[in-house]
């Protein structure tokens, strides 16, 4: 019973039993209510608190404080709880026992890299699709935020006991690919001295000029020696593959990798598009009008029907979405699918739910997370264009300037629905003002203490953690205890910004401990106990950084 989640469940069960005992004694009527507990803002109120008496007051006709005292009288201490108290205007507070806190240090040292793991998912299969940028140009910081959200959620859900696959959906079947191919062929001809115009709907960035030059270096004028339509298609395929490699390299620089790169084209060549359409037609969700094929999403509560095949016979993006989600849920049998999209896809969410329902799938199994964009700043000044290219700044440039760890932390630092400012100068500061430096410096400081202990040949393996008792020591343990709860919270809410807050709070608790308590002293027994605490801190902080996809430096 060394997990904070186990204690949390014990507290909730004890409150439920207290309500039943109070009912049996005629002190309150039979009531059905969800019992919740939370950490008080001030630690002097205990480690957990519930406002249950405030919520029961109206139904029972009793004052909240009277209810708090009644319920508290039926709750026994023990099982990691040393104190149960009441506080105005009607809270019941619970305090962890020192014995449980000290024993947790041993638990952390034993579990090591698996500390924080929980079995919430039970092996349930989850697919997370994110980034999925068109393979027609470099990815930018907006894509970077989606990438970090997706990879961090994958880390967390794996820690929570889910089987997770991370997937990049390659949009390689739409009109944008045709425009890319026409643009590249025009730039290729220009690079060889030919007169060719870049199409109006093409891609006008410098990167296309560079890509064409790369093609000339590798293939010479090979593609001028064949029919233009064949040359344009073949060269375009090579160019698209090269662009995907560049996108993959940029994402790897951000420490983001994928299990699957899924081609949109395969939905059509593999027959899954037709199968999905047949299901919708069989369920009477397909209509023909205005020379187009429509999905009757209004039958499922959407505000309007949606075109899936245009009057010219070409499928829409939504048609591909239908086939893709048929593939996810029915072909590959994922229990849950999470799509991470930019906020500009807000209008697509309701029709996606309707489409999944029309395929005969519970729409609750589909979650779409929308994230807001990032405003890039330098010392408070807005950064609009790249100094290098004069165009929109790429993700690669930001990573090269501030590093992958800083990018990941700042991209996670706000909730997905919040727009965020990313100050490049702040991200590079080596001071406590920079949260990335502050957190990683705590880990480096921990490692320096352990290195010093090793130099002094201090064997702390037999250290007695029951000797710990200073306020700063216990506060640090309390904060370390929260990691499994953070994993549970993020897995339930899909809000990974909680990790960044937790990392800063944990680092702060360690820095305060370091300030208040001398680790290596003349007291050999206390030194060993504190070295155990320091080592446990290393494990928890490194685990937190790992979940965020960041490194844990041993020196800075």
UniProtKB/Swiss-Prot annotation:
Signal sequence residues: none
Keyword Ribosomal protein: no
CC annotations in GO: cytoplasm
One Pfam family from the record: DALR_1
Catalytic class of the enzyme: ligase
Motif ('HIGH' region): 133-143
Molecular function via GO: arginine-tRNA ligase activity; ATP binding
Classification via SUPFAM superfamilies: Anticodon-binding domain of a subclass of class I aminoacyl-tRNA synthetases (SSF47323), Arginyl-tRNA synthetase (ArgRS), N-terminal 'additional' domain (SSF55190), Nucleotidylyl transferase (SSF52374)
GO BP of this protein: arginyl-tRNA aminoacylation
Keywords associated with the record: Aminoacyl-tRNA synthetase, ATP-binding, Cytoplasm, Ligase, Nucleotide-binding, Protein biosynthesis
Quaternary organization: Monomer.
Family, similarity comment: Belongs to the class-I aminoacyl-tRNA synthetase family.
Protein name: Arginine--tRNA ligase
